[in-house]
């Protein structure tokens, strides 16, 4: 019998690093009975942080998926006749900016999210990045202000920052009773009652007590705001609100909040202290009450690859099967694991699925429900499920899996380009092939990891999203694949750009006895005016000067040539080519001749199109005590930083600047020295900008010098 999707939640837990995501997830697993003891991040025992590097560093690197169950509603933890069992698929995502890809691919397949904020720090830079990603995928969310027990905790400041920094509409559903070491409970604004958690049973039960006198005014103010906010989303409530607000029932308020959350008009805010076991059960109740089930969201849309017609798939087991592979991982015991979100239909274990990217059928050998890195075998999966499958020979992140007779391609996942690289080689020559195999496995798992061979130096260059990202990859090569690696100094992922448009004629001729080679093209080449990436190719040839069958080869030649720019062989990411004239030879012309003419023509023409070197610019935010503001800003200025302003937060300043990545290697260590370890920095990729002429010349000289060695 198909499960009732009304009681299914696919959620993610997202936040800035150190906001308490993994600790909150561990408490959820404890309270839902999936673990019998609480794992602590600082002890390296968190269930969801299962990679060795995660347990050592106390940060989450990969998005671990877990299925758990929660009974709701209950009274003091006891079931009633109205209690239902909810199935909750939780994806715990990393907060470090280098692992944004894990957040991106998780949000693509979620129905709702819990956004965690630290009561002390409020909205931090990575919170803003993740919030924007959730907006992009239209993921409804509820907010949880964590760490209310910490010195400097300020619930109302956090709510204010959610509004001002994220442009959200936060509506508190609770008001904290006390803060810092006096935090002991909350006032539930919907039921208008105070709740104090019992420490004896780790917060499993609570006492309902009178609302403290000193909070009554604040409670009245925020309850009024809550009523006003939800009344706007329901005409019946609005009428009741104006006539007699006291007639509005708890159930009506909750239904209105749910409606407003699902259409992303509001973000309810709860609070607690996960580490002290306070507030997590109410958060689980809120997940069940306010976040959508697969049935509450519009059917997923896609395209039929054969007809290119738009199609939809409803979350129903009777619809044709459709799933999206959102993560590939390698398990030492079962091999390649493909994590999937099933949008429609049903799939039994040991059956075949059709991969719309490869155009091939593959047999799944096993289906599994995941609990961090442990697998529980299951017989089948159906609409709404998040699970893992074993048996794929060729699978990539973003692949759509269907049955062969009902094809559909769902919107894939777009990942950012890497900005930093290291040259790598094995310490032992005998390990060259082993390294190649290991790297191809890691690249399969991580779409933001790129590996390429520098044609001129012969070096293998591994590129990623930041120093920590690549450090962890090299660590994995050592631990998982037993490889010893030599790595070069960090390399910036420079790019090249054309800044003027020129016309060029290229004639490619080769005569070696017998049939020769001939192609003649005249084209305009320059920067795109629309600011988009890639090649914008237009064919303006009339009268058959070049036969139509050769045009795709010309386009292919230009697209391939963009990989090596004219100055220092860095890629040209964006350009336009207008093919305006040319000629061909009846016998000697073929597709390859025209492709080569385009490649050679690009090389010659690009030199004359005012090429420049582009460098990645990072948005840097440094949180520092007031007394170090001067040294911090001075240091950023020395690094060619452009200041974007400062925000005061108590006795600290948040210094914001845009700084070229090339000036930031080892910055975190230097910052520690400047501020005696009292400042923290986040570096987020912002954009590419032109390198100043003098520096560009030295970059080109350096590349040419390396190539000539």
Swiss-Prot record:
Any Gene Ontology CC annotation: cytoplasm
Record-stated family: Belongs to the TRAFAC class translation factor GTPase superfamily. Classic translation factor GTPase family. EF-G/EF-2 subfamily.
Protein localization: Cytoplasm
Keywords assigned: Cytoplasm, Elongation factor, GTP-binding, Nucleotide-binding, Protein biosynthesis
A Pfam family hit: EFG_C
PROSITE patterns: G_TR_1, G_TR_2
All residue ranges annotated as the tr-type G domain in the record: 6-295
Descriptive protein name: Elongation factor G
Function recorded in the entry: Catalyzes the GTP-dependent ribosomal translocation step during translation elongation. During this step, the ribosome changes from the pre-translocational (PRE) to the post-translocational (POST) state as the newly formed A-site-bound peptidyl-tRNA and P-site-bound deacylated tRNA move to the P and E sites, respectively. Catalyzes the coordinated movement of the two tRNA molecules, the mRNA and conformational changes in the ribosome.
């Amino acid at each position: 019998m198909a499960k009732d999707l009304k009681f299914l939640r696919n959620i993610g837990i997202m936040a800035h690093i150190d906001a308490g995501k993994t600790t909150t997830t561990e408490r959820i697993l404890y309270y839902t009975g999936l673990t019998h003891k609480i794992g602590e991040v600082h002890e390296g025992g968190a269930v969801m942080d299962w990679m060795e590097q995660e347990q050592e560093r106390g940060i989450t690197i990969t998005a671990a998926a877990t299925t758990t169950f929660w009974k709701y509603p209950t009274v003091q933890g006891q079931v009633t006749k109205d209690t239902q069992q909810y199935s909750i698929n939780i994806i715990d995502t990393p907060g470090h900016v280098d692992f944004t890809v894990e957040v991106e691919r998780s949000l693509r397949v979620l129905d709702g999210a819990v956004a965690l904020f630290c009561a002390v720090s409020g909205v931090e830079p990575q919170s803003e990045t993740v919030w924007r990603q959730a907006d992009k995928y239209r993921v409804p969310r509820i907010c949880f202000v964590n760490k209310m027990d910490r010195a400097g905790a300020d619930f109302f400041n956090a709510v204010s920052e959610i509004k001002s920094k994220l442009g959200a509409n936060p509506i508190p559903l609770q008001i904290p009773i006390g803060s810092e070491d006096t935090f002991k409970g909350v006032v539930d604004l919907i039921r208008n009652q105070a709740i104090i958690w019992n420490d004896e049973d780790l917060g499993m039960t609570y006492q309902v007590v009178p609302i403290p006198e000193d909070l009554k005014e604040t409670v009245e103010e925020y309850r009024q705001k809550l009523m006003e906010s939800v009344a706007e989303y329901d005409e019946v409530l609005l009428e009741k609100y104006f006539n007699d607000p006291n007639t509005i029932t708890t159930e009506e308020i909750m239904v209105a909040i749910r409606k407003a959350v699902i259409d992303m008009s509001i973000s309810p805010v709860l609070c607690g202290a996960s580490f002290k076991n306070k507030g997590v059960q109410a958060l689980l109740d809120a997940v069940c009450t306010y976040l959508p089930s697969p049935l509450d969201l519009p059917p997923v849309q896609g395209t039929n690859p054969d007809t290119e017609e738009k199609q939809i798939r409803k979350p129903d087991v009777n619809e044709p099967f459709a799933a999206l592979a959102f993560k590939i991982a390698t398990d030492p015991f079962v091999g390649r694991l493909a994590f999937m979100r099933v949008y429609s239909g049903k799939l039994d274990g040991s059956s075949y699925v059709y991969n719309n990217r490869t155009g091939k059928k593959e047999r799944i050998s096993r289906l599994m429900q995941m609990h961090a890195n442990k697998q529980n075998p299951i017989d089948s999966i159906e609409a709404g499920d998040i699970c893992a499958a074993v048996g794929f020979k060729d699978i990539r992140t973003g692949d759509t899996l269907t049955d062969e007779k009902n094809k559909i391609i769902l919107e894939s996942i777009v990942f950012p380009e890497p900005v930093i690289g290291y040259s790598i080689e094995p310490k032992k020559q005998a390990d060259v092939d082993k390294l190649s195999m290991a790297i191809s496995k890691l690249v399969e798992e991580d779409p933001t990891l790129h590996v390429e061979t520098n044609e001129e130096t012969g070096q293998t260059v591994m590129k990623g999203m930041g120093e920590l990202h690549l450090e962890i990859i090299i660590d994995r090569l050592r631990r998982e694949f037993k490889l010893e690696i030599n790595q070069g100094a960090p390399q910036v992922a420079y790019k090249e750009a054309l800044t003027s448009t020129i016309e060029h004629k290229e004639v490619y001729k080769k005569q070696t006895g017998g049939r020769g080679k001939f192609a003649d093209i005249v084209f305009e080449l320059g920067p795109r005016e629309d600011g988009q990436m890639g090649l914008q190719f237009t064919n303006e040839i009339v009268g058959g000067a070049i036969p139509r069958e050769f045009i795709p080869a010309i386009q292919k030649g230009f697209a391939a040539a963009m990989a090596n720019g004219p100055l220092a062989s860095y890629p040209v990411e964006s350009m336009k080519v207008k093919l305006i004239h040319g000629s061909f030879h009846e016998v000697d012309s073929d597709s390859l001749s025209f492709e080569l003419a385009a490649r050679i023509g690009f090389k010659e023409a690009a030199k004359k199109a005012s090429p420049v070197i582009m460098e990645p610019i990072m948005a840097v935010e440094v949180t520092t005590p007031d007394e170090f503001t001067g040294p911090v800003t001075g240091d950023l200025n020395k690094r060619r930083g452009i200041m974007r302003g400062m925000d005061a937060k108590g006795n600290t300043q948040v210094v914001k600047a845009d700084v070229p990545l090339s000036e930031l290697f080892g910055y975190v260590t230097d910052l520690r020295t400047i501020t005696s370890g009292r400042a923290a920095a986040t570096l987020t990729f912002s954009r590419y900008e032109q390198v100043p002429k003098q520096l560009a010349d030295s970059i080109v000289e350096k590349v040419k010098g390396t190539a000539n060695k």
